[in-house]
Protein backbone atom coordinates (compact mmCIF):
# COMPACT_ATOMS: atom_id res chain seq x y z
CA UNK A 1 0.00 0.00 0.00
CA UNK A 2 2.85 2.36 0.79
CA UNK A 3 4.33 1.73 -2.64
CA UNK A 4 1.01 2.61 -4.29
CA UNK A 5 0.68 5.83 -2.31
CA UNK A 6 4.27 6.76 -3.11
CA UNK A 7 3.65 6.16 -6.79
CA UNK A 8 0.59 8.40 -6.75
CA UNK A 9 2.46 11.07 -4.86
CA UNK A 10 5.21 11.02 -7.48
CA UNK A 11 2.58 11.87 -10.10
CA UNK A 12 1.40 14.95 -8.23
CA UNK A 13 3.64 17.87 -9.19
CA UNK A 14 3.41 21.28 -7.55
CA UNK A 15 4.61 24.41 -9.30
CA UNK A 16 7.69 25.87 -7.62
CA UNK A 17 8.50 29.57 -7.78
CA UNK A 18 12.02 30.72 -6.88
CA UNK A 19 11.81 34.41 -7.75
CA UNK A 20 13.38 36.87 -5.30
CA UNK A 21 11.96 40.25 -4.37
CA UNK A 22 15.38 41.93 -4.43
CA UNK A 23 16.14 40.90 -8.01
CA UNK A 24 12.65 41.75 -9.16
CA UNK A 25 12.96 45.16 -7.48
CA UNK A 26 16.09 45.91 -9.53
CA UNK A 27 14.29 44.88 -12.73
CA UNK A 28 11.28 47.06 -11.87
CA UNK A 29 13.50 50.01 -10.91
CA UNK A 30 15.50 49.87 -14.15
CA UNK A 31 12.30 49.43 -16.15
CA UNK A 32 10.71 52.43 -14.44
CA UNK A 33 13.71 54.68 -15.03
CA UNK A 34 14.11 53.69 -18.69
CA UNK A 35 10.38 54.05 -19.32
CA UNK A 36 10.42 57.56 -17.85
CA UNK A 37 13.57 58.57 -19.77
CA UNK A 38 12.14 57.32 -23.08
CA UNK A 39 8.71 58.87 -22.40
CA UNK A 40 7.02 55.46 -22.32
CA UNK A 41 8.67 53.96 -25.40
CA UNK A 42 10.54 51.37 -23.30
CA UNK A 43 7.30 50.07 -21.72
CA UNK A 44 6.96 46.98 -24.01
CA UNK A 45 10.51 45.86 -23.20
CA UNK A 46 9.80 46.46 -19.51
CA UNK A 47 6.71 44.22 -19.62
CA UNK A 48 8.66 41.46 -21.38
CA UNK A 49 11.49 41.58 -18.80
CA UNK A 50 9.07 41.36 -15.88
CA UNK A 51 7.14 38.47 -17.38
CA UNK A 52 10.32 36.64 -18.42
CA UNK A 53 11.72 36.82 -14.88
CA UNK A 54 8.54 35.29 -13.46
CA UNK A 55 8.37 32.55 -16.11
CA UNK A 56 12.01 31.52 -15.88
CA UNK A 57 11.74 31.22 -12.10
CA UNK A 58 8.63 29.04 -12.30
CA UNK A 59 9.42 25.32 -12.50
CA UNK A 60 7.35 22.19 -13.02
CA UNK A 61 8.96 18.82 -12.36
CA UNK A 62 12.31 20.65 -11.98
CA UNK A 63 11.98 22.17 -15.45
CA UNK A 64 11.70 25.99 -15.82
CA UNK A 65 9.32 27.72 -18.17
CA UNK A 66 10.75 29.92 -20.94
CA UNK A 67 9.38 33.14 -22.41
CA UNK A 68 10.72 34.24 -25.80
CA UNK A 69 8.56 37.27 -26.64
CA UNK A 70 10.43 40.42 -27.62
CA UNK A 71 9.83 44.02 -26.69
CA UNK A 72 10.23 45.00 -30.33
CA UNK A 73 7.27 42.87 -31.43
CA UNK A 74 5.09 44.32 -28.69
CA UNK A 75 6.23 47.86 -29.50
CA UNK A 76 5.33 47.57 -33.19
CA UNK A 77 1.90 46.22 -32.25
CA UNK A 78 1.20 49.00 -29.75
CA UNK A 79 2.49 51.61 -32.19
CA UNK A 80 0.15 50.40 -34.95
CA UNK A 81 -2.85 50.46 -32.59
CA UNK A 82 -1.90 53.97 -31.44
CA UNK A 83 -1.55 55.17 -35.05
CA UNK A 84 -5.00 53.83 -36.00
CA UNK A 85 -6.51 55.39 -32.88
CA UNK A 86 -4.77 58.70 -33.62
CA UNK A 87 -5.99 58.72 -37.22
CA UNK A 88 -9.59 58.15 -36.10
CA UNK A 89 -9.39 61.04 -33.61
CA UNK A 90 -7.78 63.28 -36.23
CA UNK A 91 -10.57 62.54 -38.72
CA UNK A 92 -13.21 63.35 -36.10
CA UNK A 93 -11.54 66.64 -35.15
CA UNK A 94 -10.99 67.78 -38.76
CA UNK A 95 -14.55 67.53 -40.02
CA UNK A 96 -14.79 63.86 -40.99
CA UNK A 97 -16.70 62.35 -38.04
CA UNK A 98 -18.26 59.63 -40.16
CA UNK A 99 -14.90 58.23 -41.26
CA UNK A 100 -13.38 58.76 -37.81
CA UNK A 101 -16.12 56.97 -35.89
CA UNK A 102 -16.21 54.20 -38.50
CA UNK A 103 -12.48 53.58 -38.14
CA UNK A 104 -12.73 53.71 -34.35
CA UNK A 105 -15.72 51.35 -34.40
CA UNK A 106 -13.83 48.88 -36.58
CA UNK A 107 -10.92 48.99 -34.14
CA UNK A 108 -13.28 48.16 -31.26
CA UNK A 109 -15.04 45.44 -33.27
CA UNK A 110 -11.82 43.56 -34.10
CA UNK A 111 -10.62 43.50 -30.48
CA UNK A 112 -11.75 39.83 -30.09
CA UNK A 113 -9.74 38.91 -33.21
CA UNK A 114 -6.75 40.79 -31.85
CA UNK A 115 -7.16 39.01 -28.51
CA UNK A 116 -7.05 35.61 -30.24
CA UNK A 117 -3.94 36.53 -32.22
CA UNK A 118 -2.37 37.98 -29.07
CA UNK A 119 -3.06 34.72 -27.24
CA UNK A 120 -1.52 32.75 -30.11
CA UNK A 121 1.64 34.84 -29.97
CA UNK A 122 1.94 34.69 -26.17
CA UNK A 123 1.34 30.93 -26.18
CA UNK A 124 3.93 30.29 -28.90
CA UNK A 125 6.46 32.40 -27.01
CA UNK A 126 5.95 30.29 -23.86
CA UNK A 127 7.57 26.87 -23.59
CA UNK A 128 8.42 24.11 -21.14
CA UNK A 129 11.08 21.46 -21.76
CA UNK A 130 11.65 23.03 -25.17
CA UNK A 131 8.02 22.43 -26.17
CA UNK A 132 5.93 25.48 -26.99
CA UNK A 133 2.32 26.06 -26.07
CA UNK A 134 -0.23 27.05 -28.69
CA UNK A 135 -3.75 28.33 -29.15
CA UNK A 136 -6.25 27.98 -31.99
CA UNK A 137 -9.97 28.74 -32.12
CA UNK A 138 -12.70 29.88 -34.46
CA UNK A 139 -12.63 33.64 -35.02
CA UNK A 140 -16.41 33.69 -35.31
CA UNK A 141 -16.79 31.93 -31.97
CA UNK A 142 -14.24 34.24 -30.35
CA UNK A 143 -16.11 37.32 -31.58
CA UNK A 144 -19.38 35.89 -30.25
CA UNK A 145 -18.01 34.96 -26.83
CA UNK A 146 -15.90 38.07 -26.26
CA UNK A 147 -18.00 40.80 -27.88
CA UNK A 148 -21.48 39.97 -29.17
CA UNK A 149 -22.75 37.77 -26.32
CA UNK A 150 -21.74 40.14 -23.45
CA UNK A 151 -23.18 43.13 -25.37
CA UNK A 152 -26.51 41.37 -25.99
CA UNK A 153 -26.74 40.24 -22.37
CA UNK A 154 -26.09 43.80 -21.15
CA UNK A 155 -28.84 45.14 -23.43
CA UNK A 156 -31.22 42.43 -22.19
CA UNK A 157 -30.42 43.29 -18.56
CA UNK A 158 -31.07 46.99 -19.22
CA UNK A 159 -34.46 46.21 -20.81
CA UNK A 160 -35.46 43.93 -17.93
CA UNK A 161 -34.48 46.51 -15.31
CA UNK A 162 -36.31 49.25 -17.20
CA UNK A 163 -39.53 47.23 -17.42
CA UNK A 164 -39.33 46.24 -13.74
CA UNK A 165 -38.70 49.87 -12.77
CA UNK A 166 -41.92 50.90 -14.52
CA UNK A 167 -43.82 48.31 -12.50
CA UNK A 168 -42.22 48.98 -9.10
CA UNK A 169 -42.54 52.77 -9.42
CA UNK A 170 -46.27 52.46 -8.95
CA UNK A 171 -45.90 50.08 -6.00
CA UNK A 172 -43.01 51.14 -3.75
CA UNK A 173 -41.30 54.33 -2.73
CA UNK A 174 -38.05 55.78 -4.01
CA UNK A 175 -35.81 54.05 -1.45
CA UNK A 176 -37.45 50.67 -2.08
CA UNK A 177 -37.01 51.03 -5.85
CA UNK A 178 -33.35 52.02 -5.54
CA UNK A 179 -32.53 49.09 -3.22
CA UNK A 180 -34.61 46.55 -5.16
CA UNK A 181 -33.35 47.57 -8.60
CA UNK A 182 -29.78 47.79 -7.28
CA UNK A 183 -30.02 44.23 -5.97
CA UNK A 184 -31.46 43.01 -9.27
CA UNK A 185 -28.71 44.80 -11.19
CA UNK A 186 -26.03 43.14 -9.05
CA UNK A 187 -27.59 39.70 -9.56
CA UNK A 188 -27.97 40.39 -13.29
CA UNK A 189 -24.32 41.38 -13.60
CA UNK A 190 -23.38 38.17 -11.79
CA UNK A 191 -25.41 36.11 -14.26
CA UNK A 192 -23.84 37.92 -17.22
CA UNK A 193 -20.34 37.38 -15.81
CA UNK A 194 -21.09 33.71 -15.15
CA UNK A 195 -22.32 33.05 -18.69
CA UNK A 196 -19.52 35.08 -20.28
CA UNK A 197 -16.68 33.58 -18.22
CA UNK A 198 -17.97 30.03 -18.78
CA UNK A 199 -17.82 30.65 -22.53
CA UNK A 200 -14.33 32.14 -22.20
CA UNK A 201 -13.14 29.13 -20.19
CA UNK A 202 -14.44 26.73 -22.82
CA UNK A 203 -12.96 28.80 -25.64
CA UNK A 204 -9.54 29.06 -24.02
CA UNK A 205 -9.37 25.57 -22.47
CA UNK A 206 -10.39 23.69 -25.61
CA UNK A 207 -8.30 25.89 -27.90
CA UNK A 208 -4.96 25.56 -26.13
CA UNK A 209 -2.30 22.94 -26.75
CA UNK A 210 1.10 21.90 -25.43
CA UNK A 211 3.10 20.69 -28.39
CA UNK A 212 1.08 17.96 -30.08
CA UNK A 213 -1.13 17.49 -27.02
CA UNK A 214 -4.40 19.38 -26.71
CA UNK A 215 -6.02 20.73 -23.57
CA UNK A 216 -9.69 20.08 -22.93
CA UNK A 217 -12.24 21.35 -20.44
CA UNK A 218 -15.89 20.91 -19.52
CA UNK A 219 -17.34 23.80 -17.53
CA UNK A 220 -20.65 23.66 -15.68
CA UNK A 221 -22.35 26.92 -16.64
CA UNK A 222 -24.68 26.85 -13.61
CA UNK A 223 -21.72 26.49 -11.24
CA UNK A 224 -19.98 29.41 -12.93
CA UNK A 225 -23.11 31.57 -12.73
CA UNK A 226 -23.63 30.69 -9.06
CA UNK A 227 -20.04 31.62 -8.20
CA UNK A 228 -20.24 34.94 -10.07
CA UNK A 229 -23.61 35.84 -8.53
CA UNK A 230 -22.30 35.14 -5.02
CA UNK A 231 -19.21 37.23 -5.79
CA UNK A 232 -21.35 40.14 -6.97
CA UNK A 233 -23.70 39.81 -3.98
CA UNK A 234 -20.79 40.58 -1.66
CA UNK A 235 -21.08 44.10 -3.09
CA UNK A 236 -24.59 44.57 -1.74
CA UNK A 237 -23.83 45.10 1.99
CA UNK A 238 -21.03 47.51 1.06
CA UNK A 239 -23.40 49.40 -1.25
CA UNK A 240 -26.03 49.67 1.51
CA UNK A 241 -23.55 51.02 4.06
CA UNK A 242 -22.01 53.45 1.54
CA UNK A 243 -25.48 54.65 0.58
CA UNK A 244 -26.36 55.18 4.24
CA UNK A 245 -23.17 57.18 4.83
CA UNK A 246 -23.31 59.30 1.70
CA UNK A 247 -27.09 59.96 1.51
CA UNK A 248 -27.01 62.97 3.92
CA UNK A 249 -24.32 64.61 1.76
CA UNK A 250 -26.46 64.46 -1.38
CA UNK A 251 -29.57 65.49 0.54
CA UNK A 252 -27.90 68.62 1.90
CA UNK A 253 -26.31 69.46 -1.48
CA UNK A 254 -29.70 69.19 -3.23
CA UNK A 255 -31.34 71.33 -0.53
CA UNK A 256 -28.66 74.02 -0.86
CA UNK A 257 -29.01 73.99 -4.65
CA UNK A 258 -32.80 74.39 -4.43
CA UNK A 259 -32.46 77.31 -1.98
CA UNK A 260 -29.93 79.06 -4.20
CA UNK A 261 -27.06 78.60 -1.77
CA UNK A 262 -24.89 76.28 -3.83
CA UNK A 263 -21.73 78.16 -2.75
CA UNK A 264 -22.06 76.56 0.68
CA UNK A 265 -21.29 73.14 -0.82
CA UNK A 266 -17.70 73.23 0.42
CA UNK A 267 -18.86 73.56 4.02
CA UNK A 268 -21.13 70.53 3.56
CA UNK A 269 -18.22 68.49 2.23
CA UNK A 270 -16.09 69.53 5.21
CA UNK A 271 -18.94 68.68 7.57
CA UNK A 272 -19.26 65.16 6.19
CA UNK A 273 -15.57 64.67 5.40
CA UNK A 274 -15.27 61.62 7.69
CA UNK A 275 -18.25 59.90 6.10
CA UNK A 276 -16.98 60.63 2.59
CA UNK A 277 -13.56 59.15 3.38
CA UNK A 278 -15.21 56.12 5.01
CA UNK A 279 -17.25 55.62 1.84
CA UNK A 280 -14.10 55.70 -0.30
CA UNK A 281 -12.46 53.17 2.01
CA UNK A 282 -15.47 50.84 1.85
CA UNK A 283 -15.59 51.24 -1.93
CA UNK A 284 -12.00 50.06 -2.41
CA UNK A 285 -12.47 47.32 0.20
CA UNK A 286 -15.53 46.09 -1.69
CA UNK A 287 -13.52 45.93 -4.92
CA UNK A 288 -10.80 43.86 -3.23
CA UNK A 289 -13.35 41.50 -1.64
CA UNK A 290 -15.20 40.92 -4.92
CA UNK A 291 -11.95 40.54 -6.87
CA UNK A 292 -10.62 37.96 -4.39
CA UNK A 293 -13.77 35.85 -4.34
CA UNK A 294 -14.31 36.04 -8.11
CA UNK A 295 -10.69 35.25 -8.99
CA UNK A 296 -10.50 32.25 -6.66
CA UNK A 297 -13.89 30.90 -7.77
CA UNK A 298 -13.08 31.14 -11.47
CA UNK A 299 -9.49 29.93 -11.11
CA UNK A 300 -10.49 26.82 -9.16
CA UNK A 301 -13.37 26.10 -11.54
CA UNK A 302 -11.10 26.42 -14.58
CA UNK A 303 -8.04 24.49 -13.41
CA UNK A 304 -9.96 21.74 -11.59
CA UNK A 305 -11.82 20.91 -14.81
CA UNK A 306 -8.86 21.27 -17.18
CA UNK A 307 -7.02 18.27 -18.62
CA UNK A 308 -4.26 17.58 -21.14
CA UNK A 309 -3.50 14.72 -23.54
CA UNK A 310 -6.84 12.89 -23.37
CA UNK A 311 -7.22 13.32 -19.59
CA UNK A 312 -3.85 11.72 -18.84
CA UNK A 313 -2.74 14.97 -17.21
CA UNK A 314 -5.04 16.93 -14.91
CA UNK A 315 -4.71 20.15 -12.94
CA UNK A 316 -5.74 21.26 -9.48
CA UNK A 317 -5.98 24.64 -7.77
CA UNK A 318 -6.36 24.89 -3.99
CA UNK A 319 -6.30 28.67 -3.47
CA UNK A 320 -8.85 30.01 -0.98
CA UNK A 321 -10.89 33.22 -0.97
CA UNK A 322 -9.79 34.29 2.51
CA UNK A 323 -6.15 33.56 1.65
CA UNK A 324 -6.40 35.66 -1.49
CA UNK A 325 -8.29 38.44 0.30
CA UNK A 326 -5.78 39.12 3.05
CA UNK A 327 -2.86 38.85 0.66
CA UNK A 328 -4.39 41.39 -1.71
CA UNK A 329 -5.07 43.69 1.25
CA UNK A 330 -1.42 43.43 2.28
CA UNK A 331 -0.25 44.09 -1.28
CA UNK A 332 -2.43 47.19 -1.71
CA UNK A 333 -1.89 48.66 1.76
CA UNK A 334 1.87 48.14 2.04
CA UNK A 335 2.47 49.11 -1.59
CA UNK A 336 0.51 52.31 -0.99
CA UNK A 337 2.30 53.14 2.26
CA UNK A 338 5.73 52.58 0.69
CA UNK A 339 4.78 54.43 -2.53
CA UNK A 340 5.21 51.21 -4.51
CA UNK A 341 8.72 50.39 -3.28
CA UNK A 342 7.56 47.19 -1.54
CA UNK A 343 5.52 46.00 -4.52
CA UNK A 344 8.24 43.79 -6.10
CA UNK A 345 8.66 41.77 -2.87
CA UNK A 346 4.88 41.51 -2.41
CA UNK A 347 4.42 40.47 -6.04
CA UNK A 348 6.93 37.63 -5.66
CA UNK A 349 5.26 36.59 -2.39
CA UNK A 350 1.83 36.44 -4.06
CA UNK A 351 3.07 34.56 -7.14
CA UNK A 352 4.86 32.06 -4.89
CA UNK A 353 1.65 31.41 -2.95
CA UNK A 354 -0.33 30.85 -6.16
CA UNK A 355 2.35 28.43 -7.39
CA UNK A 356 2.26 26.45 -4.12
CA UNK A 357 -1.48 25.97 -4.58
CA UNK A 358 -1.27 24.79 -8.19
CA UNK A 359 -0.70 21.10 -8.90
CA UNK A 360 -0.31 19.05 -12.07
CA UNK A 361 -1.48 15.45 -11.66
CA UNK A 362 -0.20 12.73 -13.95
CA UNK A 363 2.91 11.03 -15.27
CA UNK A 364 4.77 13.92 -16.87
CA UNK A 365 7.80 11.77 -17.67
CA UNK A 366 5.76 9.62 -20.06
CA UNK A 367 4.36 12.62 -21.93
CA UNK A 368 5.76 12.83 -25.46
CA UNK A 369 7.68 16.08 -25.87
CA UNK A 370 7.07 16.99 -29.50
CA UNK A 371 6.45 20.47 -30.83
CA UNK A 372 3.48 21.29 -33.00
CA UNK A 373 4.96 21.98 -36.42
CA UNK A 374 2.43 24.69 -37.27
CA UNK A 375 4.39 27.95 -37.74
CA UNK A 376 3.43 31.23 -36.11
CA UNK A 377 1.26 33.39 -38.36
CA UNK A 378 2.92 36.49 -39.74
CA UNK A 379 0.02 38.41 -41.32
CA UNK A 380 -1.03 42.04 -40.70
CA UNK A 381 -3.53 41.07 -37.98
CA UNK A 382 -0.83 39.18 -36.09
CA UNK A 383 1.54 42.15 -36.30
CA UNK A 384 -1.03 44.51 -34.85
CA UNK A 385 -2.10 42.01 -32.17
CA UNK A 386 1.19 40.89 -30.63
CA UNK A 387 1.06 43.64 -28.03
CA UNK A 388 -2.45 42.65 -26.92
CA UNK A 389 -2.22 40.69 -23.67
CA UNK A 390 -5.77 39.62 -22.75
CA UNK A 391 -6.44 39.23 -19.03
CA UNK A 392 -8.49 36.25 -17.91
CA UNK A 393 -9.39 36.18 -14.18
CA UNK A 394 -9.22 32.38 -14.11
CA UNK A 395 -5.51 31.93 -14.96
Question: Could you describe each region identified by the protein language model?
Answer:
Residues 10-11, 16, 24, 76, ...:
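Membrane-proximal intrinsically disordered regions of secretory-pathway and membrane-system proteins
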Residues 111-120, 149-150, 185, 189, ...:
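Hydrophobic alpha-helical transmembrane segments of membrane proteins
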Residues 2, 232, 247-248, 268, ...:
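Intrinsically disordered cytosolic tails
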Residues 86-107, 157-189, 239-291, 347, ...:
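Membrane-helix interface segments in multi-pass membrane proteins
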Residues 33-42, 170-171, 333-342:
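Short hydrophobic membrane-inserting alpha-helices and related fusion/pore-forming segments
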Residues 2-24, 28-161, 189-201:
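Transmembrane-helix bundle segments that line or gate the permeation/cavity pathway
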Residues 55-64, 68, 122-139, 202-224, ...:
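Juxtamembrane inter-helical linkers in multi-pass membrane proteins
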Residues 21, 70-83, 136-156, 217-238, ...:
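Loop-to-transmembrane boundary segments
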Amino acid sequence: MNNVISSKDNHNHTLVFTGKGGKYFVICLVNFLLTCITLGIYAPWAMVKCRRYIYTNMTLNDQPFAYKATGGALFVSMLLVFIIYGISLSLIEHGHPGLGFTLFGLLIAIIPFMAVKGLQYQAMMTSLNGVSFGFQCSMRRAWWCMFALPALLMVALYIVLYVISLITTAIGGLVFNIVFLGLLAIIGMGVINGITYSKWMTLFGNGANFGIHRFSIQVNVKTCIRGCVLAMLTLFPFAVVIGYLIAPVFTDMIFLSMTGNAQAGESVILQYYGQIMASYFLYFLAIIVVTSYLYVTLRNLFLNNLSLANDSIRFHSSVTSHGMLWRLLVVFVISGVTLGLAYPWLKMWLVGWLAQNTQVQGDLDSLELTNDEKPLENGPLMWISRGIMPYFPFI
